Amino acid sequence: MKKLTFLLVIAGSIALAMCFLFFHASSSSIRLSKGTAARTEKKKMSENSFLTMQADCQFMKLKDPKTGLIPPGIRSRELAFTSKLPRYAEDAGQSWTWRGPTNIGGRMLCITVDIDDQNHLLAGSASGGMWESTDQGLNWHKSTAPDAEQSATCLVQDKRPGKHRTWYYGTGEMLSTTDRNISTNARTIGIGNGIYKSTDNGATWQPLAATQGASPSGLNEIFQGVWRIVTDPVRMDKDIVYAACYGAIMRSENGGISWQVALGDIENKSFATDLAITSDGVLYAGLSSFCLSVEPPGKAGIWRSTDGFNWTKITPADARSLITCSIP
C-alpha cells in the first residue's frame, strides 16, 4: 500500500511538472511572438519613415539659416555661379572615353507621339527632365537645359493646323515620392516650378515666366504642381492653353505669357485637379475635395464649360474626393 501511494505521488509530481513546463513554454512563446511582432512593426515604421526623415535632413542642409527657407531659383543661381569659377584645362595628355551614366532619365511620367511623325517621341521624367527620340525610341537624348526644372509630369502638343511645333510640359509630382500616396509633407513631394514651352518641336525648352519663382521650401503656389495641360483645338485667333494645377484650373490666351484663374478656390486649394477637352473645345474639369487647408475647397467636384469662363457643376452624388478626367 505504501509502495502504491509512493508511486502515485511520483506520478502526480511528474504530471504537475509537465503542466508547469507546458504553460511556461506557451507563455514564453506568446511573449516572444508579441515581442517579434512589435519589433517587426517598429522596423516597418522605421522603413516607411526613413525617406521622409532623409528628405527633412536634406532640407535642413539646403535652407537659408536666416529665413528657414530654400531660396527661390537657387539651382539656376548655383549653376550660374559655378560656370564662372576657374577651370583646370590641363589633362596631362590623358585620353578619356565617356562611360556613363547613360540611364539618367529616372521614372517616366509622360510620353507623347508627334502628330506629324510617329518616329518622333517626347517623354518626361520625374527628376531627369525631357527626353527626345527620332527613331521610335531606339535612341534618346535629353532636351532640357541643366538649369531648367527637371520634374516633367505632363506633356501636350498643340494640335491645331500650323501649330504642331509648339509643345508644353508641366512640373511638380504631387504624389509622395516615398509611397505614391497623397502627402502633406512638402519635402516628400516633387514640388515643381511652373510650365515650360517649346516652339521648335521639342528640341529646346523655355520657362514661362508667369509660372516661375516659387520657393521649393513648401507647397504654396498654384504652379508648383501641374497635373495636366491641354490646348484649345478650335480657336485659331488666340493661343489658348489650360493647365490643371494645384488648387485651380488656369487659362492663358497668349500661349502662356499670362494666366488667369478659370476655375478654383485660391484660398482653400484643391490638392488634385484634372482636365480634359473635346475635339470641339468643350472642357471637363475635376477638382478634389481633399486639401491642405482647414476649410474645404469651394469648387470641389466635376465641372463642364464650353468657353473656359462659365462652368456648370455636373458632379454625381457618389463622387469620390480625387477625380481624374478622361475623354475617349
Regions found by a protein language model. Name each.
Residues 2-328:
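Extracellular glycan-interacting surfaces
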